[in-house]
Design a protein with these regions (language model features):
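Nucleotide-activated sugar donor-binding and catalytic core shared by glycosyltransferases
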Residues: 1-237, 243-388
Length: 388
């Protein structure tokens, strides 16, 4: 029996690891799953845990008002050490590019515990866009022993960085596994305001740190202008809980009649709001991956993206945070049916709904079958104190 510990702290991580956790549980004859949450994002994380009926074995509950990235890193490093010592997992599994991912991987390295990185190999090639995610994932790739790349492009990025090809498995993205299950559900919104929307709906999400300040103001100016240009179109914005977002969005957008500002939605209603949308404006990485499966064109409110596959396929466009560009590209999609249909019809390059199965099979191949040994084994681990 081999023990696989899944460590995560935010809503996107939970969504993308949920299919893997469920798949691990289906292999309980050979793999024992242990779930650890840091609760880097408490409220938004808990809603996903409830949706997928995941009960953590350990909850570090590190979230605190106003804490910075250094605070999160230190808390994870200090608190997870005792969990690693108690459980002594054969593999620590992390997902993505959050501060939890980097800190949990570093702590595992200090304990000589192998690390598997789900969604490995994504690169924007700009260390400040997105911030801090680009550096988090690069550093995690240096630490990781197994790399689950969602696409061939991600695999190629890892190759160029010198990662051993035998440690890489191309899987597709687990977010599609979760999405396809949830999108098939019959659903009605609790809020009749959303149920009663007629006509075209533009869905907006924006929350990234690198956009705080002037870029965020530019995004909001574009939304206000578009709402006035298209009074028959409804613009729906689930506003992130971060004060840097809310303190800009509500004063600028709160009094426009066809802009609906709502609280962040739980995972299931948000997926169904995406289904209802005509166009999606977002800076979210996960939405860039999900939208093609729902046949929704995406305008990416960022300077660069580490997910170029959808842009290359033609289902997404990088529009940045410039007010004029956002207005121009959104107008194009609202008025040009041919262009809209072209973007909406691409095949999703990010997955087919079977990524979790590939991940667990590869883990079994590495751990159970021993066909490719992970270099550092349980009986060679050192007990080194964590230094931060």
């Amino acid at each position: 029996m081999y023990k696989v510990m899944c460590v995560f702290g935010t809503r996107p991580e939970a969504i993308k690891l949920a299919p893997v956790i469920k798949e691990l549980q289906r292999h309980a004859d050979s793999l024992k799953s242990v779930v650890v949450v840091t609760a880097q994002h408490r409220q938004m994380l808990d809603s996903v845990l409830n949706v997928f009926a995941i009960k953590p074995d350990y909850d570090m509950n590190i979230m605190a008002t106003g804490q910075g990235l250094s605070d999160i890193t230190c808390k994870v490093l200090k608190n997870i050490e005792s969990i690693y010592e108690t459980e002594r997992p054969d593999l620590v599994l992390v997902q993505g590019d959050t501060t939890t991912v980097f800190a949990a991987s570093l702590a595992a390295y200090y304990k000589h515990i192998p690390v598997g990185h789900v969604e490995a190999g994504l690169r924007s090639h700009d260390k400040y866009h997105p911030f801090p995610e680009e550096i988090n994932r690069r550093l995690t790739s240096v630490i990781a022993d197994i790399h689950f790349a969602p696409t061939d492009k991600a695999k190629d990025n890892l190759f160029r960085e010198g990662v051993d090809k035998d440690s890489i498995c191309v899987t597709g993205n687990t977010v599609i596994d979760a999405l396809l299950d949830v999108a098939a559900l019959d659903f009605k919104f609790d809020d009749n305001l959303l149920n009663n929307i007629t006509g075209k709906l533009v869905l907006i999400t924006a929350h990234r740190r690198e956009s705080f300040g002037k870029p965020f103001i530019s995004i909001c100016k574009a939304i206000v202008t578009l709402a006035k240009l298209y009074p028959d179109v409804t613009f729906v914005y689930p506003v992130h809980l971060n004060p840097n977002v809310r303190n800009t969005v509500y004063p600028m957008l709160g009094d426009v009649s066809n802009i609906i500002l709502i609280e962040p939605l739980e995972y299931v209603p948000f997926i169904h709001l995406m289904k209802r949308a005509y166009i999606i404006l977002t800076d979210s990485g996960g939405i860039q991956e999900e939208a093609p499966s729902l046949n929704k064109p995406v305008l990416i409110l960022r300077k660069v993206t580490e997910r170029p596959e959808a842009v290359k396929a033609g289902g997404a466009k990088l529009v940045g945070t410039n007010t004029h560009t956002i207005i121009e590209e959104t107008t194009h999609l609202l008025e040009d049916t041919k262009e809209y249909n072209r973007m909406a019809s691409i095949a999703n390059p990010f997955g087919d709904g079977h990524a979790a199965q590939r991940i667990v099979n590869f883990i079994k191949h590495k751990l159970v079958k021993n066909e490719q040994k992970i270099t550092v084994r349980l009986n060679t681990r050192e007990k080194s104190p964590i230094a931060v």
